C-alpha cells in the first residue's frame, strides 16, 4: 500500500481526508480544493485510483487558481493529523434499491474506515456520507467513541437543497431566493417542513396550493431514487458533494451556520440514542448546538416515525456486524 508521489502535505495547513474516491469523494475533493478550504487526502482501497485522481486535480490547480495540495493514497498513515474526515466509501445505490438495502455491505466498510481514520486523526471531526446515512453515522459514532459534537452525517443539507430546487422550478424563481429545511432520516420518511419554506421571506403556503406543495414534498423524498433510475449506473454525486462541502466550510471557517445535519440526539425533540436530521449550528468544534424547532403534532409524529425506522436499522446493522465478527 503506497501513497502518491505528489509533494507531501504541510503539517501546519488544514487537512481534510476523504475516505472513498468514488464520484462523491472525488467531486468533494475538487470542491474543497477549489474553494481553497484545505489540503486534501483522497483515500481508497483500489491501488492507483486515488493517486490518479489526485494527480488530475493537481494539474488543474493553475486553471482554477489555487495552491492546495492534493494527494491520493491507499494508506491511512497518510491521513494523519486531519482536521476533518469525510467517509464516502461504500456500495452505491442501483436502480430499485433503497438506501436501507445497502445496510449489510456498507456497515462493515464504514466501521473499518472510522476505526482506521480515528487512529491517525484522533482530534478530527467526522462527517459520514455513506448510505443508509443515519445508521452509518451511528455506527461510526460507536466505532470511534467520539463525543457527539464531533461526528455527524450529511443528509439534511442535500434534502433541503432538493426541496428548494423543486420549489424554485415550480415558481420559476432564483433557487438562492428559496429557503427550506428538511428534518428526519435520509430516506422515504424524511420530514420536509413546508411551514418554514420561504421565497425571499414569503411563505410558500402563500404562493402554492396544498396539493402542489405535497407533490413537491414527495418528489423531494424520492429525489435520490429519481436520479438513480435515470442514470442506471449509480446515484447523485454533484449535489451530495456540494452539500458536504458546505458543512466542511462552516467547520473550517468557524461560520456557525445553521444547517440540517444528522446528529446523535440526547433528549432533543423527545428522542434519545438515535441519529436523525435536525438543525445544528456548525463551527470549528463541530456541532456547537442543536436547535429545537417548534413542530406541529404531525411534524413531530413524522420525526418520531423516522427515528423509529432508523433505530430498527441500527439494531439490524449491529446484528449483522456481530454475526460477521463471530463467523
Swiss-Prot record:
Annotated keywords: NAD, Oxidoreductase, Tricarboxylic acid cycle
Classification via InterPro entries: L-lactate/malate_DH (IPR001557), Lactate/malate_DH_C (IPR022383), Lactate/malate_DH_N (IPR001236), Lactate_DH/Glyco_Ohase_4_C (IPR015955), Malate_DH_type3 (IPR011275), NAD(P)-bd_dom_sf (IPR036291)
Residues the record marks as active site: 186
Enzyme class: oxidoreductase
Reactions it catalyzes: (S)-malate + NAD(+) = oxaloacetate + NADH + H(+)
EC id: 1.1.1.37
Binding, substrate: 93, 99, 131, 162
Similarity field: Belongs to the LDH/MDH superfamily. MDH type 3 family.
Protein name: Malate dehydrogenase
Native source organism of the sequence: Nostoc punctiforme (strain ATCC 29133 / PCC 73102)
Gene: mdh
